[in-house]
């Protein structure tokens, strides 16, 4: 299965099963990007005086949708109330999280600029909520298996787990427009 072929250059073939899926498989591509990404750009509406109240504000967060062998599509965060973005979320819990396939090797190998539509980007929009106690074990495993240093961060910063309850999945992975992926299709797809 080849993702695509341009100018005789092949990207991902059956010989490289860890590469991205074919671009036509939009739900699977979205899950692949969400699972492969270690960090993303979270955009909120700012409540901070230093950032002109009510303007968009973005911040980088380490994320995980589960351990390497168990991607769920649900994005988990480990955050502190000391972070401006977390303060923003208390006022307005809706946010957008953007990932770029440029984080991995694929776009570099294909010599795609991060803005090239063939270098896929995924934006998940939803409501940020604190992880409930019955889900804390999995959230911890998801985050600390992918970001082990986080488990040693200062307790005094009052770290806690959040997740994004998805409302919309937006994917651009090819020339000619974007795909809005139904949530059911997104969660049904596998990132592997």
Enumerate the predicted regions with their spans.
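Binding-site signature for planar aromatic cofactors or substrates
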Residues: 1-192
């Amino acid at each position: 299965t080849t993702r695509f072929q341009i100018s005789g250059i092949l990207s991902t073939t059956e010989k490289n099963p860890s590469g991205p899926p074919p671009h036509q498989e939009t739900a699977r591509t979205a899950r692949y990007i969400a699972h492969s990404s270690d960090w993303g750009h979270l955009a909120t509406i700012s409540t901070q005086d230093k950032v002109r109240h009510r303007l968009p504000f973005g911040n980088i967060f380490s994320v995980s949708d589960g351990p390497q062998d168990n991607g769920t599509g649900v994005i988990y965060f480990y955050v502190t109330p000391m972070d401006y973005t977390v303060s923003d979320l208390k006022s307005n819990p809706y946010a957008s999280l953007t990932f770029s396939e440029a984080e991995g090797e694929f776009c570099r190998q294909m010599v795609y600029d991060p803005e090239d539509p063939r270098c896929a980007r995924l934006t998940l929009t939803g409501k940020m909520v604190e992880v409930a106690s019955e889900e804390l074990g999995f959230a911890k495993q998801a985050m600390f298996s992918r970001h082990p240093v986080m488990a040693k961060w200062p307790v005094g910063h009052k770290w806690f787990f959040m997740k994004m309850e998805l409302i919309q999945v937006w994917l651009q992975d090819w020339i000619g427009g974007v795909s809005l992926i139904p949530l059911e299709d997104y969660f049904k797809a596998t990132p592997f």
